[in-house]
């Protein structure tokens, strides 16, 4: 029987594998192309995972959030442009999205006033920044909903065949 790690500061890849009760050997067999030694290097942060390895782990562990984590925290481009998405319940995602959409509805006229001339003047800057931040919150809510959907599909909570049939109509 494999021993359980007692390491305190486990990274997300280590925690995810252990949450599935997989040894490194079993995870390697599941993924077919990543050796137990490579998994150990990734988990002990002696080596960063490659994007293709993260994609494979996300698929085989049924945790699409690993891709977002990698992009937001380990990819130099993603660190600058990709926000880390936190896993939330569907109701919380929808309520946050609706709150942001309602706020933007109230700001729609102001956005038109600010941008109609193609310039942002000093007296418009504060409102423009607020609107930008609200749009970013909407974007994050959309990404969170997408990640939630991917996880539900990966784990079988949402029937992938039905989902794809409806999506491809």
What positions do the PLM features span?
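DNA major-groove recognition helix of helix-turn-helix/homeodomain DNA-binding modules
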Residues: 52-70
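Short alpha-helical DNA-recognition segment
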Residues: 19-41
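DNA major-groove recognition helix of helix-turn-helix
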Residues: 31, 42-43, 53, 61
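A short, Lys/Arg-rich alpha-helix, primarily the initiator
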Residues: 1-19
């Amino acid at each position: 029987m494999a021993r359980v790690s007692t390491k305190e500061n486990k990274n997300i890849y280590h925690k995810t594998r252990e949450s599935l009760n997989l040894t490194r050997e079993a995870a390697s067999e599941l993924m077919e192309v990543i050796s137990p030694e490579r998994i150990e290097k990734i988990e002990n942060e002696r080596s960063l995972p490659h994007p293709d390895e993260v994609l494979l782990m996300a698929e085989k562990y049924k945790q699409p959030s690993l891709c977002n984590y990698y992009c937001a925290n380990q990819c130099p481009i993603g660190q600058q442009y990709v926000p880390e998405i936190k896993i939330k319940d569907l109701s919380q995602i929808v309520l946050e999205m609706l709150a942001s959409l309602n706020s933007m509805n109230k700001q729609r006229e102001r956005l038109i006033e600010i941008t109609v001339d193609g310039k942002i003047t000093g007296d418009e800057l504060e409102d423009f920044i607020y609107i930008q931040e609200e749009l970013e919150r909407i974007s994050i809510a959309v990404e969170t909903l997408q990640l939630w959907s991917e996880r539900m599909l990966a784990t079988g909570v949402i029937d992938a065949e039905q989902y794809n049939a409806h999506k491809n109509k």
